[in-house]
Amino acid sequence: MNPFQQNESKETLFSPVSTEETPPRLSSPAKKTPPKICGSNYPLSIAFIVVNEFCERFSYYGMKAVLTLYFLYFLHWNEDTSTSVYHAFSSLCYFTPILGAAIADSWLGKFKTIIYLSLVNVLGHVIKSLSAFPILGGKVVHTVLSLVGLCLIALGTGGIKPCVAAFGGDQFEEKHAEERTRYFSGFYLAINAGSLISTFITPMLRGDVQCFGEDCYALAFGVPGLLMVIALVVFAMGSKMYKKPPPEGNIVAQVVKCIWFAISNRFKNRSEDIPKRQHWLDWAAEKYPKQLIMDVKTLTRVLFLYIPLPMFWALLDQQGSRWTLQATKMNGNLGFFVLQPDQMQVLNPLLVLIFIPLFDLVIYRLISKCGINFTSLRKMAVGMVLACLAFAAAATVEIKINEMAPPQPGSQEILLQVLNLADDEVKLTVLGNNNNSLLADSIKSFQKTPHYSKIHLNTKSQDFYFHLKYHNLSIYTEHSVEERNWYSLIIREDGKSISSIMVKDMENETTYGMTAIRFINTLQENVNISLGTDISLNVGENYGVSAYRTVQRGEYPAVHCKTEDKDFSLNLGLLDFGASYLFVITNSTKQGLQAWKMEDIPANKVSIAWQLPQYALVTAGEVMFSVTGLEFSYSQAPSSMKSVLQAAWLLTVAIGNIIVLVVAQFSGLVQWAEFVLFSCLLLVVCLIFSIMGYYYIPIKSEDIQGPEDKQIPHMQGNMINLETKKTKL
């Protein structure tokens, strides 16, 4: 810093003195002063911009919070497909900002770009909400509408991403740089507030509200769409107050053209007779100005450090996909509150708001007092290590979940349980195949085997013969089964004898946190069971078996049941996370129906609170990596290259999501092993980044100031030339 300069927020401390007379200037008409907020230096127009950003971020993060479970529950995609499409959408949201910036800088300007692409965003939310209406066609229609809606949302939300914050900065005069800095802090707060509130509310709209007999995804997508409409209306209301700078040209395009020309010109002049140049970018000197070439040289040094960064984002962005899927296999009952699986994502914005001041005001200062030179690159490397530890913690939790989960049938295997609905005990033997020892004990009346038994098959499908011994009777029955399935053999009275029914249970896949229930009706009349306004089950007479239905976790003390001439209520009790229940309707009295409740698959046992350490670690890593990375990048590049750096930073996020997409589709690993893989990959990348950072020589701020950053007034007489800096955000 110049010794005469004490405050960088001021343009200059001394005015140049000239001995020559200055000719009088013609008076120009005074510019109309824009309205301020409560007499401050803040333009009133920024209030509309901040509210717009809050609503837009609410719509984006709210929709995204329930997106993975929408793929699972509504479209019935598997985990890998759901993860891949989720990250493909996220990646597209970070590619489209380059398009939005190009449109704003080269054609429409920021204001019109925000308006037009917000309309595209609104249309995308409307289509996305329509894709969640079961009455609108079948699965193909829902899938097409969903993908079209997501593409429009990605174009809209990504396209305005580089425009809104910068447009707010345009509203300030240069002399109000301090207020502009505080505006950006408020803008960032609006982003996190929108994310925090939406990731808490939209899962409640999904799970606590029922429509069309299931979770109300139409409402969970519709409310964010409504917030996007509000965002557009609020932004348009401030139109007359805004400063609307005209398009200034796309610096990103200029940089790309400069690099391309330098490379092509170098290859055209490969002859040994042509003198070599000091730097490969110097081959652009025939077409581009020297200052631009110097700025691009400085830029490429920073972009080289960006090469390892996508791997960090590959881990960070799995909070909404793989970690949400993990939460569906855990128990969300915290005692004082029941947390939905997709609500765990609220921890990230909440912890960001806590960790940023904690790190800035406490941790970094303590490290500095210990005499440790904790540079920006070191902070970023530590952030990577914390993300590695977060995924190691996630792998540990996943292993514990697998230990508590019921066994899965493999190739040429089935899992079998036996339910005895007869009035006395039954001895059952599986004939042949050395399976007769699996069911050695007698099964008492209205009891079941304590767990599923694994039965081995000779082929993929097979007929099994069972010997049932009841009183003095011996009954032989035959049933067909197929590999990799769960079965219940139901023994029932048949006059003075018994018979059996083989029923396929829930398939060998998780219910993703939902509760699965079904009914067996032993009465001689049909029973209709209503589980909600739109959920109804018809159970046939004489040991009819209903289909499975999935419902939200909760207490069901009075489920409405109806026979041909009577109405009853049935107490199902607590239906817990991830469990599968069988209710056997055994009797009908004046007081109501009586049912035997049996838990086929136990509820999730691992508490969702065990995800807290991994969220805390990855969020701490995000604060150290993301915030510090942007700060470092901006300090190492000329002001003319800030927008290029922003585009490159967003590209690293997009590439990180593509990495997750590829791994999810082609790794073929079990989930805990995939978490370990990501952790190890980032650790290797962290080592590479640390080596790159070790040899990186930071550039001093005065070495990268362009002409627009300097004021060197011409002085006459014995006055001293003073160099003055402008504050850059």
UniProtKB/Swiss-Prot annotation:
<protein>
    <recommendedName>
        <fullName>Solute carrier family 15 member 2</fullName>
    </recommendedName>
</protein>
<dbReference type="GO" id="GO:0045087">
    <property type="term" value="P:innate immune response"/>
</dbReference>
<feature type="transmembrane region" description="Helical">
    <location>
        <begin position="140"/>
        <end position="160"/>
    </location>
</feature>
<feature type="transmembrane region" description="Helical">
    <location>
        <begin position="612"/>
        <end position="632"/>
    </location>
</feature>
<feature type="glycosylation site" description="N-linked (GlcNAc...) asparagine">
    <location>
        <position position="528"/>
    </location>
</feature>
<keyword id="KW-0325">Glycoprotein</keyword>
<keyword id="KW-0399">Innate immunity</keyword>
<feature type="topological domain" description="Extracellular">
    <location>
        <begin position="205"/>
        <end position="217"/>
    </location>
</feature>
<feature type="transmembrane region" description="Helical">
    <location>
        <begin position="344"/>
        <end position="364"/>
    </location>
</feature>
<dbReference type="InterPro" id="IPR004768">
    <property type="entry name" value="Oligopep_transport"/>
</dbReference>
<feature type="glycosylation site" description="N-linked (GlcNAc...) asparagine">
    <location>
        <position position="508"/>
    </location>
</feature>
<feature type="topological domain" description="Cytoplasmic">
    <location>
        <begin position="161"/>
        <end position="183"/>
    </location>
</feature>
<feature type="transmembrane region" description="Helical">
    <location>
        <begin position="644"/>
        <end position="664"/>
    </location>
</feature>
<keyword id="KW-0769">Symport</keyword>
<comment type="subunit">
    <text>Interacts (via extracellular domain region) with trypsin.</text>
</comment>
<feature type="transmembrane region" description="Helical">
    <location>
        <begin position="88"/>
        <end position="108"/>
    </location>
</feature>
<feature type="topological domain" description="Cytoplasmic">
    <location>
        <begin position="696"/>
        <end position="729"/>
    </location>
</feature>
<dbReference type="GO" id="GO:0140206">
    <property type="term" value="P:dipeptide import across plasma membrane"/>
</dbReference>
<feature type="modified residue" description="Phosphoserine">
    <location>
        <position position="9"/>
    </location>
</feature>
<dbReference type="InterPro" id="IPR018456">
    <property type="entry name" value="PTR2_symporter_CS"/>
</dbReference>
<feature type="transmembrane region" description="Helical">
    <location>
        <begin position="675"/>
        <end position="695"/>
    </location>
</feature>
<keyword id="KW-0812">Transmembrane</keyword>
<feature type="region of interest" description="Extracellular domain (ECD)">
    <location>
        <begin position="402"/>
        <end position="611"/>
    </location>
</feature>
<dbReference type="GO" id="GO:0030670">
    <property type="term" value="C:phagocytic vesicle membrane"/>
</dbReference>
<feature type="topological domain" description="Cytoplasmic">
    <location>
        <begin position="365"/>
        <end position="380"/>
    </location>
</feature>
<feature type="topological domain" description="Cytoplasmic">
    <location>
        <begin position="239"/>
        <end position="295"/>
    </location>
</feature>
<feature type="topological domain" description="Extracellular">
    <location>
        <begin position="79"/>
        <end position="87"/>
    </location>
</feature>
<dbReference type="GO" id="GO:0015835">
    <property type="term" value="P:peptidoglycan transport"/>
</dbReference>
<keyword id="KW-0571">Peptide transport</keyword>
<feature type="topological domain" description="Cytoplasmic">
    <location>
        <begin position="1"/>
        <end position="57"/>
    </location>
</feature>
<dbReference type="InterPro" id="IPR029028">
    <property type="entry name" value="Alpha/beta_knot_MTases"/>
</dbReference>
<dbReference type="GO" id="GO:0042937">
    <property type="term" value="F:tripeptide transmembrane transporter activity"/>
</dbReference>
<dbReference type="GO" id="GO:0070424">
    <property type="term" value="P:regulation of nucleotide-binding domain, leucine rich repeat containing receptor signaling pathway"/>
</dbReference>
<keyword id="KW-1133">Transmembrane helix</keyword>
<feature type="region of interest" description="Disordered">
    <location>
        <begin position="1"/>
        <end position="34"/>
    </location>
</feature>
<dbReference type="InterPro" id="IPR036259">
    <property type="entry name" value="MFS_trans_sf"/>
</dbReference>
<feature type="topological domain" description="Extracellular">
    <location>
        <begin position="665"/>
        <end position="674"/>
    </location>
</feature>
<comment type="similarity">
    <text>Belongs to the major facilitator superfamily. Proton-dependent oligopeptide transporter (POT/PTR) (TC 2.A.17) family.</text>
</comment>
<feature type="transmembrane region" description="Helical">
    <location>
        <begin position="114"/>
        <end position="134"/>
    </location>
</feature>
<dbReference type="GO" id="GO:0015333">
    <property type="term" value="F:peptide:proton symporter activity"/>
</dbReference>
<keyword id="KW-0653">Protein transport</keyword>
<feature type="transmembrane region" description="Helical">
    <location>
        <begin position="218"/>
        <end position="238"/>
    </location>
</feature>
